[in-house]
């Protein structure tokens, strides 16, 4: 594993982080044992764990806190999120957004609840979860985040954009006006906008970008076929069929990135992200030991050559020479 910091900050991270979203819910299908997954991640050198209070309505944080209880706190980084009203009745399923609350009072109340679930006195990164512009413009909210930092309950704060790709203006204002330490966004070989704009802004402000959905919801893991179907609770079931059909064609255009026995398609996808200036880490959602080993191996996989990077840029500019498929 390799390590870096978030831009000009002192927030450290393993290049490959552990996205815990799937733990405690069934929105990614079945998952392996959370305690053993986290233990193996630590063995592989992963130090950064990204969760959120809305994931399984707090249960995710409980699982992460339990799994990390024996880890040396000064050797790991815990990142969580706030902004949604929790509802115990929705612990298993993730469909649909809940009411949001970005009041200063909720930020403090939510953080204190997260600290209890995570079994820690502080979090390394506290993120606004899918904020809209009105939340990012709230001076009272950011004053409260500064107060919480002064109290030692958080080290850095940032913004996690979503739920879907986009939110360009929100991200740029968070970086350039609010001067957040971190911004988390969808970014991968197939989906590079508006991530490229965020990377440029982060380089100017000294922040770090966290790339979520780095394998485009599994497409770049090279495990789907045109016949692939997803379970009834799997969020990918709700994507249009064109996403799968076009994605598979694009992956074939990227086949040159694979080096047999040295760099898989998954690892090439993560490595490409890690070679973009301004990236702090990649945050794949981990559901199994096989995925975990594959993701962690990306940090030490061979870099993409300049020629390969240029070829990717040319393909992306031409939409990978793929005709739009019918939904």
Where do the language-model regions lie?
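Acidic (Asp/Glu)-rich catalytic clusters
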Residues: 8-10, 67-73, 77, 115-119, ...
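Residues at the N-termini of beta-strands
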Residues: 15, 48, 122-125, 156, ...
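Active-site mouth loops of central-metabolism enzymes
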Residues: 21-32, 93-105, 130, 134, ...
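Structural motif corresponding to the early beta-alpha repeats
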Residues: 74-102
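Beta/alpha (TIM)-barrel catalytic core signal, keyed to glycine-rich beta->alpha loops juxtaposed to Asp/Glu
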Residues: 131-325
């Amino acid at each position: 594993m390799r390590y870096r910091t978030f831009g000009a900050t002192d927030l450290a991270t393993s290049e490959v982080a552990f996205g815990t979203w799937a733990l405690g819910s069934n929105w990614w299908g079945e998952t392996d044992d959370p305690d053993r997954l986290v233990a193996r991640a630590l063995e592989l050198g992963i130090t950064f764990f990204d969760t959120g209070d809305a994931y399984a309505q707090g249960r995710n944080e409980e699982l992460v806190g339990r799994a990390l209880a024996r880890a040396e706190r000064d050797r790991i980084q815990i990142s969580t999120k706030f902004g949604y009203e929790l509802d115990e009745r929705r612990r298993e399923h993730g469909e649909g957004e809940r009411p949001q609350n970005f009041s200063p009072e909720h930020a403090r109340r939510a953080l204190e609840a997260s600290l209890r679930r995570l079994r820690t006195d502080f979090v390394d990164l506290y993120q606004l979860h899918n904020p809209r512009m009105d939340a990012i413009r709230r001076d009272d909210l950011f004053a409260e985040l500064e107060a919480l930092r002064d109290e030692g309950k958080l080290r850095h704060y940032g913004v996690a954009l979503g739920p879907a790709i986009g939110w360009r203006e929100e991200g740029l204002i968070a970086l350039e006006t609010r001067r957040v330490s971190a911004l988390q966004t969808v970014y991968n070989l197939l989906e590079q906008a508006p991530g490229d704009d965020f990377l440029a802004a982060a380089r100017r402000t000294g922040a770090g970008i966290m790339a979520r959905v780095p394998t485009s919801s599994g497409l770049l893991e090279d495990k789907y076929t045109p016949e692939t179907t997803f379970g009834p609770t799997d969020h990918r079931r709700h994507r249009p069929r064109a996403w799968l059909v076009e994605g598979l064609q694009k992956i074939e255009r990227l086949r040159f990135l694979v080096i047999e026995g040295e760099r898989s398609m998954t690892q090439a996808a993560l490595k490409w992200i890690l070679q973009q200036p301004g990236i702090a880490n990649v945050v794949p959602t981990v559901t199994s030991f096989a995925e975990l080993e594959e993701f962690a191996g990306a940090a030490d996989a061979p870099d993409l050559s300049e020629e390969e990077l240029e070829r990717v840029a040319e393909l992306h500019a031409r939409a990978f020479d793929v005709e739009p498929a019918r939904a």
